[in-house]
From Swiss-Prot:
Any GO molecular function: ribosome binding
Domain (S1-like) ranges: 1-72
The keyword Lyase appears for this protein: no
CDD domains: S1_IF1 (cd04451)
Subcellular localization, as worded in the UniProt entry: Cytoplasm
One cellular-component annotation, GO: cytosol
PANTHER family for this protein: TRANSLATION INITIATION FACTOR IF-1, CHLOROPLASTIC
Protein name: Translation initiation factor IF-1 1
Domain of life the protein comes from: Bacteria
InterPro entries: NA-bd_OB-fold, RNA-binding_domain_S1_IF1, TIF_IF1
Function: One of the essential components for the initiation of protein synthesis. Stabilizes the binding of IF-2 and IF-3 on the 30S subunit to which N-formylmethionyl-tRNA(fMet) subsequently binds. Helps modulate mRNA selection, yielding the 30S pre-initiation complex (PIC). Upon addition of the 50S ribosomal subunit IF-1, IF-2 and IF-3 are released leaving the mature 70S translation initiation complex.
Similarity remark: Belongs to the IF-1 family.
Length: 72
């Protein structure tokens, strides 16, 4: 799978879960599980409930996502 195959969407963090995972509600109303991308972990980007985030979904599993950006 190449990087071009991902689906980018906007969402809002609903709640924190253990192991740096989050429940994210997407713009279209779906709720997915999201984990923080590696660069966000390296730079200690904090994500709290209510934050607007950009997530990447793969076409293979639309219930899990990678959080790649936190909007201000």
């Amino acid at each position: 799978m190449s990087k071009d195959d991902v689906i980018q969407m906007q969402g809002e963090v609903l709640e924190n879960l253990p192991n740096a995972t989050f429940r994210v509600k997407l713009e279209n109303g779906h709720v997915v599980l999201g984990h923080i991308s590696g660069k966000m972990r390296m730079h200690y980007i904090r994500i709290l409930p209510g934050d607007k985030v950009t997530v990447e979904l793969t076409p293979y599993d639309l219930t899990r996502a990678r959080i790649v950006f936190r909007s201000k």
